[in-house]
Regions:
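Accessory carbohydrate-recognition regions in carbohydrate-active enzymes
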Residues: 1-174
C-alpha cells in the first residue's frame, strides 16, 4: 500500500481505488481514484483503526455517492512516496498533492473548473459541525479490532478559502 505519513504520526494517507473489497481498498493496477483515505492505524489484515475518505470533485454530481464521485487516474503518472502523494483526477482535471505531518497533513488541490467541492465519505457513525467560515469538525466511529464500541476518531478540517456552503450540524450512520 502506498502509505504517506511520518514515523510515529497520528494519521496515514493513501489513495483509495475501490470500496468493494473490504480492507483491501487499494490495488496498484486499478485506474479508479475514489479519494484520499485518512486512517489512524492502517492494516489491510485487521482493517483500519478508524478512517474517512476525502474526494476532490468539480461540477454537479447526479447522486451524492462515492460511485458517482470517483474518477479515473493514471498510477504511472502519479507520485506515491512516504512524504507525498501527487496525482491527477482525469474526470475533473484536478491535480492534488497531499503532504503528511505529525498530527495531520496538507492537501493542496488545483481545480481547473468551477463549482468545486471536497466530498467527505464518513462510514459508520459520525457527527459533523462547522466551527467557522474556515473549519469543520468531524467525529467518526468506524473502528476495526477494538473492544470499545464508542472508540472515536476526531479531526478538524481547516480550509484556506472560506467555505461557500454552510454546514448545519449533522450526525448519522452510514
Amino acid at each position: 500500500l502506498p502509505y504517506t505519513g511520518v514515523p510515529f504520526g497520528m494519521n496515514f494517507y493513501a489513495p483509495q481505488t475501490t470500496d468493494q473489497k473490504g480492507s483491501w481498498w487499494f490495488h496498484p493496477e486499478d485506474r479508479t481514484f475514489q479519494g484520499y483515505r485518512v486512517t489512524h492505524q492502517p492494516s489491510p489484515w485487521m482493517g483500519d483503526f478508524s478512517h474517512l475518505l476525502m474526494t476532490p470533485v468539480s461540477g454537479s454530481l447526479s447522486e451524492l455517492s462515492l460511485f458517482h464521485a470517483q474518477s479515473s487516474y493514471r498510477p504511472e503518472e502519479s507520485l506515491f512516496s512516504p512524504v507525498e502523494i501527487n496525482l491527477t483526477q482525469l474526470r475533473y482535471q484536478i491535480t492534488s498533492q497531499l503532504i503528511p505531518s505529525m498530527y495531520g497533513g496538507i492537501l493542496t488541490i488545483d481545480y481547473q473548473q468551477k463549482d468545486n467541492h471536497l466530498l467527505l465519505t464518513l462510514p459508520g457513525r459520525y457527527q459533523v459541525k462547522q466551527l467557522d467560515d474556515h473549519q469543520v469538525a468531524v467525529k467518526v466511529i468506524n473502528y476495526s479490532g477494538c473492544e470499545d464500541p464508542d472508540f472515536s476518531f476526531y479531526f478538524v478540517l481547516h480550509f484556506e478559502q472560506p467555505l461557500t456552503k454552510w454546514f448545519a450540524p449533522s450526525s448519522g450512520e452510514d
